[in-house]
């Protein structure tokens, strides 16, 4: 109770003494680099509406940034611009902080395409607040229930096996399991970009998922990741179908249905494909199952 009251008073003081162009996105997040794929990503959860529209920034083949606490959004695009010019995250962050009168209220992390990392937690970020840098990642949090949140995130990211989405999701789950944001939970986001830019923006984004307002944002984010994987396989199936590789297409359509079994449209297109090549014996049972739902 005392800690909650202290937090409320602290927030009131900070909001009355900060510029109107900042937003109090107090939260926990991770920026990370996958050295096996080159992918770069940011994942975040907050008790603030649409955290994904403010905190995470990433550019294929360049880097990723998380800007939070009393958010100054410019750290995102300016950080990416600096990394695109070849500057190290530490240099960029130092320069940006030097020009920011509100630096003590900021929490920022940056990682580049080589895994170089830099992070900052301002002295006036509300407790519990801190960050931890490890190989190819940084985790950071403020207004947390416990000071164990970001160490738990680091351990989860390091120990989890899987792709970048799996590992960053594990970090978010670990934060919530330690108590998470003292104020509760509201929104979450995951942004992942490719390691090698194609010059085609929509191809360079591997994953861009947002839960803007939800009572259990991490649970919903995991559901969206699962659906995203389903449609990745469905898209691969369509690609194989265009190439006339029917067997490969059917394998991908099957995988899509496994990830998203509650959606009848995915097996429907499997049946359409089979019917299109004249294999009605296999197509009809799938059609029946789809239309019985």
Regions found by a protein language model. Give the residues of each.
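Conserved alpha-helical positions within TPR/SEL1-like repeat arrays
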Residues: 268-269
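Structural marker of alpha-solenoid helical repeat scaffolds
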Residues: 259, 292-293
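Register position in tetratricopeptide repeats
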Residues: 242, 276-277
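Alpha/propeptide regions of enzymes that mature by internal proteolysis
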Residues: 17-183, 190, 212-245, 254, ...
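Bacterial Sec-dependent signal peptides at the C-terminal "C-region" and cleavage site
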Residues: 3, 7-23
């Amino acid at each position: 109770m005392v800690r909650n009251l202290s937090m409320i008073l602290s927030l009131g003081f900070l909001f009355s003494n900060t510029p109107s162009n900042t937003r109090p996105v107090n939260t926990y997040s991770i920026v990370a680099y996958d050295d096996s794929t080159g992918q770069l990503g940011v994942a975040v959860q907050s008790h603030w509406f649409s955290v994904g529209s403010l905190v995470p920034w990433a550019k294929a083949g360049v880097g990723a940034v998380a800007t939070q606490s009393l958010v100054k959004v410019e750290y995102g695009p300016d950080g990416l611009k600096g990394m695109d010019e070849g500057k190290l995250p530490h240099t960029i962050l130092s320069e940006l902080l030097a020009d920011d009168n509100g630096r003590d209220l900021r929490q920022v992390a940056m990682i580049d395409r080589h895994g170089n990392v830099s992070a900052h937690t301002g002295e006036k970020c509300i407790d519990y607040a801190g960050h931890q840098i490890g190989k190819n990642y940084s985790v950071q949090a403020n207004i947390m229930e416990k000071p164990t949140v970001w160490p738990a995130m680091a351990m989860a990211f390091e120990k989890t096996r899987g792709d970048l989405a799996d590992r960053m999701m594990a970090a978010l789950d670990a934060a919530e399991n330690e108590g998470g944001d003292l104020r509760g939970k509201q929104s979450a986001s995951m942004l992942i970009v490719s390691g090698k830019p194609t010059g085609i923006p929509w191809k360079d984004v591997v994953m861009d998922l947002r839960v803007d307002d939800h009572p259990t944002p991490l649970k919903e984010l995991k559901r969206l990741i699962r659906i995203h994987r389903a449609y990745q396989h469905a898209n691969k199936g369509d690609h194989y179908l265009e190439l006339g590789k029917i067997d490969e297409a059917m394998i991908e359509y099957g995988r899509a249905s496994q990830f998203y079994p509650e959606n009848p449209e995915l097996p429907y297109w499997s049946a359409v494909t089979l019917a299109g090549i004249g294999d009605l014996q296999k197509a009809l049972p799938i059609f029946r199952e789809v239309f019985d739902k």
